[in-house]
Amino acid sequence: LCIMLGANKNKTDLLKIYHDLPQKINVEEPKINKDLRLINALIQVESNGNDSCIGDRHLIIPSVGCLQIRPIMVREVNRILAILGDNTQYKNKDRYSHEKSIEMFLIWKNFHHKDHSNEVIARSWNGGPKGPLRKRTIHYWYKVQKELSKNSKDSLGI
């Protein structure tokens, strides 16, 4: 897991991120393990574990960080936190933080996709709210599936 995440992260570090989040991200251990596998796969597809990765340079505002987060996602996460009564506010520079990127992903995922499949979550992450309906996200999902199959439970220590 440490190598795959591109930093000295292990399962304990990632579980700490989970438990340090606000109480609204209250998830059972088996669900956390599933989320961690998906997060790892998304990080590999999005940035190959590079927290400084800058993508979509052809756009006015690029996506950045290990999960290739755009400013609109930072705003969405802050909106979710406000709805949930949490005063935490993320900044665009937080996209470069491995931990904060994962936190933002989990807040978004647990608000919009709490009980959805990995496919719906991944395709929405890539293509927005209508991602699962867009043909262009199918190839992205195949790449995520490939990473998920590489990262068996044994290799993650789960």
Language-model regions: role of each:
Residues 1-6:
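Hydrophobic membrane-insertion alpha-helices, especially the h-region
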Residues 10-158:
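Catalytic glycan-binding domains that act on GlcNAc-containing polysaccharides
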